[in-house]
Amino acid sequence: MNKYSLVAKIEKIAPLHTQEAWDCSGWIVDNPDVVDVKKIMLALTVTDKVYELAKSKNCDMIIAHHPLFEVPIRYRDMQIYSSHTPMDKAENGTTETLIRRLRFVNFKIENEFVRVVEQKISVSELKNKLKQISPNLRLINNNGTETVSKIGFCAGSGSEFIDCGDYDCFVTGDVKYHTAVETEKVVFDIGHFESEILILDRFKEILGIEVVMSDEKSPFI
């Protein structure tokens, strides 16, 4: 398999030019002498454990969501590519994949990272839906609200967007303490890992080939 052809499929949906200035999406390790790859592993984050598993499974390429800002020398025998904020912003990207997994049908684009579902639902019912993805989620409901009708979603770290829209509920993966204390909205912190791990299935769908999935688990118990 030509590694550049595979990456082109991802970049057609999540172009690199859309990444944030601080992001390091793209080729993390790109050995120009290696064009064809035999087996690919998909991972949320490339760690030592993920790298060793890829080697043990005879993978010669890893496609990950999170980029590496520093690359250990020993990783350089593995072709590594990441699509982080481009995939977060993309149509059917990280946040939209989360919404669809929850079986919400319609949503609107609030901004590059946030999608909004307009549907009246009880807080308890929404909590039960989210628990299917994140059993250990945290609920912030400072006003004891029982029903919401406009839900903002942002997979990953979305704390900065909680009060950026007129939604009355927000679902994200990381909520800062002081934001949680001060917000008037219903907020679900479902965990960074849980909110983004679903994107690996989307990567597989985009590539249209057999892949090896990493066995990553959330670091929080």
Locations of the language-model features?
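Active-site catalytic microenvironments in core metabolic enzymes, especially phosphate/sugar-handling
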Residues: 1-221
